């Protein structure tokens, strides 16, 4: 006697009702496998996807066989594009906002658009996902709460030095994005200001050559001076005073 056919059980929650609005979708920061099922569902159902760089986003969409209309939304055209997108939402469309990696609006384009959509009284929905900031913080081994995120460090060396000096005096962990072309200069500044201060350089997060280089600012500077890094970089700087459990001299965990 044949066994009865096996069917998948009904989902515990019904699929989300598709209504007009702006959906802010976090995308992978390196590993395409990190995209969430909900993000894929929202992308597949979008009437329009506004992305930082269409060439970058199309690679993600092609990987998951998603074919939806795209427009660019970046720092150069956001003010002009925002009214167009608001008109699409008012007309009944579901518009998705993505950046090249991670959460849109956070050190990426989109905050002016979101402000305008909120001001217009229209729906804004966030689909969370990968974050370079939280990934670097969680893997740093430094205190995670509280923390300060300063976005990209200043391009000019003088302004960058001022930012780094402030970070060294904070009572919390500080996190910044930095370019591989400036990281050696940045580490040199840190080594000059506080050579024994604990820092972490997180590089190529979630990718094949992911690296966490931990140590004093002097040792990390020396490491990368000998072998300049490539790829996306997140810099994590320890607070001015480390808690007892995280002190380099600590030998036993607190009870």
Q: Which stretches of residues belong to each language-model region?
A:
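Class I SAM-dependent methyltransferase SAM-binding "motif I" and its flanking Rossmann-like core
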Residues: 112-170
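Conserved helicase motor
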Residues: 73-79, 153-156
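Alpha-helix capping/helix-boundary segments
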Residues: 55-57, 102-103, 132, 182, ...
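A contiguous loop/helix-start segment that scaffolds small-molecule binding in enzyme catalytic cores
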Residues: 9-11, 19, 94, 172-255
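Short active-site oxyanion
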Residues: 43-49, 121-124, 173-174
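Short beta-strand scaffold positions
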Residues: 51-52, 108, 177
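Glycine/small-residue-rich loop that forms an oxyanion/phosphate-binding "nest" at active or ligand-binding sites
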Residues: 71-74, 82-131
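Glycine-rich, flexible N-terminal cofactor/catalytic loop recognition
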Residues: 4-75
């Amino acid at each position: 006697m044949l066994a009865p056919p096996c069917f998948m059980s009904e989902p515990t929650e019904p699929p989300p009702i598709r209504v007009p609005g702006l959906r802010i979708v976090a995308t992978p920061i390196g590993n395409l496998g990190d995209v969430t099922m909900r993000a894929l569902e929202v992308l597949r159902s979008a009437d329009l996807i506004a992305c930082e760089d269409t060439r970058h986003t199309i690679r993600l969409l092609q990987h998951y066989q998603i074919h939806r209309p795209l427009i660019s939304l970046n720092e150069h055209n956001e003010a002009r594009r925002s009214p167009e997108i608001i008109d699409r939402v008012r007309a009944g469309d579901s518009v998705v906002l993505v950046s090249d990696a991670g959460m849109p609006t956070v050190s990426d384009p989109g905050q002016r658009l979101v402000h305008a959509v909120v001001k217009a009284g229209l729906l804004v929905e966030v689909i969370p996902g990968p974050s370079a900031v939280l990934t670097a913080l969680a893997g740093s081994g430094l205190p995670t709460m509280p923390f300060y995120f300063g976005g990209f460090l200043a391009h000019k060396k003088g302004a960058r030095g001022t930012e780094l000096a402030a970070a060294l005096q904070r009572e919390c962990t500080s996190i910044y994005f930095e370019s591989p072309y400036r990281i050696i200069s940045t580490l040199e500044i840190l080594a000059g200001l506080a050579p024994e201060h604990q820092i972490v350089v997180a590089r190529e997060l979630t990718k094949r050559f992911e690296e966490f280089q931990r140590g004093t600012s002097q040792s990390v500077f020396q490491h990368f001076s000998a072998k300049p890094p490539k790829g996306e970089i997140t810099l994590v700087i320890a607070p001015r005073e480390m808690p007892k459990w995280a002190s380099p001299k600590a030998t036993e965990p607190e009870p």
